[in-house]
Amino acid sequence: MGLLLPFALTFDALHPMPSPKNFGLIGAAGFVAPRHMKAIVDTGNKLVAALDPNDSVGIIDSYAPNAAFFTEFERFDRHAEKLRHMGDEHRLHYVSICSPNYLHDAHCRFALRIGADAICEKPLVLNPWNVDALQELEEETGQRIWNVLQLRLHPAVIALKERIDAESPGKRHQVDLTYITPRGKWYDVSWKGDPSKSGGVASNIGIHFFDMLMWVFGNVQHSTVLRNEPRSMKGELVLDKADVKWDLSVQASDIPSGHTGAYRSLRLDGEPFDFSEGFGDLHTRVYENALLGDGFSLQDVTPSIVLAQSLRKARS
């Protein structure tokens, strides 16, 4: 996809903004859901229905207090079908998906089957063959699945990619990635601690970094897993233009001495690469592009899914 101007600048008097679109949201109580709610409102659209089995969703009041809310999928489905029969003014045009990882593809199928596009959090799916099934459904329905790969829209990452693309062929870089985000005992009991539901550490906390690195430095030529444990993974990647050492963990004991909370470090050829600022509106940018039909496609997201699945299955 190309780089786009902010949504408000892509329309003018001769090409006015289209009428607001209706959004449904699945996973309204999740930690990332407020970013989606904000993006829906910031792009001039309406959240009209939301779903989550947990009812701690007071955040909805900040964005769409009149949105219908459901704790059961069947009732949400019934409501969406009712809206569909009420005509284009009322139907869901998009469904935002923030549910647990292992439910993403099912909820994407729901969106497409009711005539809506899906905007799905990462990872889209846990296994590459599930992407093939979604591709077939896109072709059958004419609807699209747009993926949240917001790091590709970060100004610092875009500038890095432009720099790497302009270099002479054959030049290689050394990349060191460490990301440690401590999680308590609850993590092991929740769906996030079950690799069959979350995809494990590689999918759950690493996939957006893997996607970014492959977008900037090219395809995977070889990968090695040095540690593969329920709470931590470590390995090396040989990409087209870089050799990458990566270390991912949710174990508090892995935090370097002197640091508290989450620890993230990305070093390029020994120098720190800072992209800690500028995250605030990236989900809104993802929505802007999806609304213009130029979002991140199934083809864009597939390489990182293939990599994460292979890392999960590898023996250290």
Please provide the spans of the model-predicted regions.
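Short hydrophobic segments within beta-strands
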Residues: 26-27, 51, 98, 148, ...
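C-terminal helix-rich "cap/oligomerization" subdomain common to oxidoreductases
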Residues: 3-19, 82-86, 94-96, 288-316
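A contiguous active-site-proximal alpha/beta segment in oxidoreductase catalytic domains
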Residues: 102, 125-185
